[in-house]
């Protein structure tokens, strides 16, 4: 008994022990009971009544953010309830947006009654355009029209891992997001739940201009000079650049550059690092042009070896450019800084299959440097500038303004250079041989009928001036009268009519004697014109106004014309065709216009078939649009392997055209079988000599004119095309966005 009494031990007390002697569980152990309170109340340690939304969140006006942990693992039945709740939240958001629209209109009307805002001084030379403030001046009795009729008209905001990406309502991605608005909200919730799990994303690979991230490997001048090829190679690259790139006369004076080029080879060590960076940009662009001349269909060892060698040269030259800029302290400005940055941006554009936000930011830095160096003020205001320097400053500034507008439109953001900030006159139409650094007095400008290398840049700059005002109007958050839209439309038509005959597009049949570069110049002038038409009238397509039918007609006609140009470029950039060697010119900037046209036609079909009041022109016209979209689908499919943007449009088109079983972007070889169409298509209507482009927009569609198109049945077939490989722009991930749209019951489903 004594031995047994000794075996009975008293209950142990102490740290980590319970009164019963069991080990105390660590406080860090997760609770096994389910979380019943909402996430916000749990985080704030508040009492939660477990309602949807709970009273605590409702009192703090956080009802839309009141979520529960159990929402992540819902069954099918409860998932339907969550979707219903999400729809209620969307309706609530729409009501808030509508209230904000009403308040905004009331505030604008109140401001108009006080008085008109005086227009800023310093208007540039050119047509008399109204300033954004002058649009709201009470010069007429017409009330401003609020064109925003849906949340999508405020632009599109996409949340991505580290932040948010915004594009304006005139951007093609915002147009598509307006179609898939519900799915976008669901995707945002899914991404929010994924982020809340605390999974760190992998380190992203740095893309785009390396200059924004600092030189990964700083280099001295000796190392930079050692990477320059032999002079025979550099001579060929410089020649290729000046003979291929139409932007070269607007940035560099060929005669002056040759003098500096010879001085470099005489004594490379005394050459400034910035000029070396300029030389590397020229070689980088020229090497890209040479690489694009290789036939992608030939896979012989010699061709593959040449392709690898050229790509290595491009990578080396691309690395040296930011090293030279940093070594030369480019942020302080100075000679050749703007020229190097502009060509560097051009090289990055051609290298990217998707639009890079870094390129737009680098363009902003270039604009700031140009302002710092006074390029926005005309040289006549300053003494000490030679006639040669003054003319080159005008050329460079005109190109900067054009690049700013083009990249801003591609990103769907307001441009950085405003017309009231500058008074720099346009450059003269002169050959490089007409003046040099020794010129005392500049010769008179040549006539517009004289097709000089700089004429295209001048004509495009004039057209882009008008388009710039239109882009400013589209980015203006204030409403303005529809009469202002009509005025801008008239000015745009006049700007197009002022294009010299030598740069006007008629048809491919009338351009067979032109150089490929000349043909592309004409096409680009046409595409930017029709893009501006869409941007100007898009918001008024479905407004309850008498003018909405006119705007809808202009938008649809412009979109169809843009896709017709896309189809023509697809055909003419094939082997043995006229533009095959110049296919590199179809860059992401050019494709942006085709993306906008594709998206706007999808947007129209959704409204035409889904609206309670029919807004469709006709059933046959809708079939024409779908035929054109089918052909564009095949074209986008070819570039979907290398472009996120193309994948997004391909999936959107698959839904809009009612093809749920569309193959993935990897099935590029099956492009001709996607819609049951043959692999070859009739030629584009843009190639037809009889299909002329009208001088202006008439009251009827050109394709409905019996004189131009007597056989309507054959016209629908003419809008079907084959694929091409083109770089496109990068936007937010939407690989899954359109997938869920396939489950919706689309009224125009063709199956």
From Swiss-Prot:
InterPro entries: Sec_Metabolite_Reg, Transcription_factor_dom_fun, Zn2-C6_fun-type_DNA-bd_sf, Zn2Cys6_DnaBD. It comes from the Eukaryota. Pfam families: Fungal_trans, Zn_clus. Residues 38-66 bind DNA. One of its GO terms (biological process) is DNA-templated transcription. Keywords: DNA-binding, Metal-binding, Nucleus, Zinc. Gene3D superfamilies: Zn(2)-C6 fungal-type DNA-binding domain. It is found in: Nucleus. One of its GO terms (molecular function) is DNA-binding transcription factor activity, RNA polymerase II-specific. Residues 107-116 have a biased composition (Polar residues). Residues 1-35, 107-153 are annotated as: Disordered. GO terms for cellular component: nucleus. Disruption phenotype: Fairly reduces the production of fusarisetin A. Transcription factor that regulates the expression of the gene cluster that mediates the biosynthesis of fusarisetin A. This is Fusarisetin A cluster transcription factor fsa6. The lineage of its organism: Eukaryota, Fungi, Dikarya, Ascomycota, Pezizomycotina. The gene is fsa6.
């Amino acid at each position: 008994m004594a031995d047994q009494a000794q075996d009975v031990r008293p209950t142990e007390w102490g740290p980590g022990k319970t009164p019963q002697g069991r080990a105390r569980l660590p406080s860090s152990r997760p609770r096994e009971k389910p979380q019943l309170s909402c996430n916000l109340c749990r985080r704030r340690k508040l009492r939660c009544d477990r309602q949807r939304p709970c009273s605590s969140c409702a009192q703090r006006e956080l009802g839309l953010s009141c979520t529960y942990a159990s929402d992540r693992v819902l069954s099918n039945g409860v998932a339907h309830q969550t979707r219903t709740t999400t729809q209620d939240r969307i309706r609530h958001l729409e009501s808030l947006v509508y209230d904000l629209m009403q308040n905004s209109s009331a505030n604008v009307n109140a401001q108009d009654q006080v008085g008109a805002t005086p227009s800023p001084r310093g208007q540039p030379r050119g047509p008399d355009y109204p300033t954004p403030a002058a649009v709201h001046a009470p010069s007429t009795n017409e009330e401003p029209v609020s064109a925003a009729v849906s949340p999508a008209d405020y632009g599109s905001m996409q949340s991505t891992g580290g932040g948010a990406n915004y594009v304006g309502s005139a951007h093609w991605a915002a147009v598509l997001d307006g179609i898939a608005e519900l799915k976008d909200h669901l995707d945002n919730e899914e991404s929010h739940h994924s982020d809340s799990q605390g999974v760190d994303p992998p380190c992203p690979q740095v893309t785009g201009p390396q200059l924004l991230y600092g030189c990964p490997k700083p280099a001295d001048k000796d190392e930079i000079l050692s990477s320059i090829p032999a002079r025979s190679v550099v001579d060929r690259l410089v020649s290729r650049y000046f003979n291929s790139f139409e932007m070269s006369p607007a940035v560099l004076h060929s005669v002056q550059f040759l003098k500096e080029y010879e001085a470099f080879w005489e004594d490379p060590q005394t050459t400034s690092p910035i000029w070396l960076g300029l030389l590397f940009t020229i070689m980088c662009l020229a090497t890209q042009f040479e690489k694009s001349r290789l036939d992608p269909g030939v896979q012989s060892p010699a061709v593959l070896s040449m392709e690898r060698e050229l790509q290595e040269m491009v990578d080396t030259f691309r690395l040296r450019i930011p090293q030279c800029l940093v070594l030369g302290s480019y942020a302080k400005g100075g000679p050749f800084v703007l020229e190097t940055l502009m060509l560097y941006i051009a090289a990055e554009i051609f290298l990217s299959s998707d639009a890079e936000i870094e390129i737009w930011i680098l363009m902003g830095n270039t604009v700031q440097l140009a302002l710092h160096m006074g390029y926005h003020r005309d040289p006549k205001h300053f003494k000490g500038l030679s006639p040669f320097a003054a003319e080159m400053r005008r050329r460079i500034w005109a190109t900067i303004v054009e690049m700013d507008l083009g990249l801003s439109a591609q990103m769907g953001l307001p441009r950085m250079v405003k017309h009231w900030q500058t008074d720099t006159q346009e450059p003269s139409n002169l050959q490089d041989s007409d003046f040099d650094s020794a010129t005392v007095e500049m010769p008179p400008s040549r006539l517009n009928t004289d097709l000089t290398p700089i004429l295209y840049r001048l004509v495009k700059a004039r057209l882009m001036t008008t388009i710039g005002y239109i882009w400013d109007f589209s980015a203006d958050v204030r409403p303005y009268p529809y009469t202002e839209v009509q005025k801008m439309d008239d000015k745009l038509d006049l700007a197009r009519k002022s294009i010299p005959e030598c740069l006007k597009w008629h048809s491919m049949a009338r351009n067979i004697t032109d150089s490929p570069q000349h043909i592309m110049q004409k096409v680009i002038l046409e595409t930017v014109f029709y893009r501006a038409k869409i941007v100007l009238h898009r918001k008024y397509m479905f407004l309850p106004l008498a003018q909405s039918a006119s705007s809808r007609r202009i938008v649809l006609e412009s979109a169809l014309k843009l896709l017709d140009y896309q189809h023509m470029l697809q055909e003419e950039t094939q082997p043995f065709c006229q533009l095959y060697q110049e296919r590199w010119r179809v860059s992401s900037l050019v494709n942006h216009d085709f993306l906008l046209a594709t998206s706007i036609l999808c947007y129209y079909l959704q409204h035409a078939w889904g609206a309670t009041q029919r807004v469709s022109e006709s059933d046959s016209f809708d079939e024409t649009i779908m035929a054109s979209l089918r052909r564009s689908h095949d074209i986008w499919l070819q570039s979907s392997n290398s472009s996120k943007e193309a994948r997004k449009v391909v999936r959107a088109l698959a839904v809009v055209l009612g093809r749920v079983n569309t193959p993935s972007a990897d099935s590029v070889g099956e492009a001709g079988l996607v819609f049951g169409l043959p692999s070859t298509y009739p030629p584009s209507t843009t190639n037809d000599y009889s299909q002329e482009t009208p001088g202006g927009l008439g009251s009827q569609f050109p394709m409905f004119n019996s004189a131009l198109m007597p056989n309507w049945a054959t016209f629908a077939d003419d809008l079907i095309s084959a694929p091409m490989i083109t770089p496109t722009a990068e936007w937010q991930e939407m690989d899954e966005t359109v997938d869920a749209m396939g489950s919706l019951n689309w009224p125009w489903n063709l199956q």
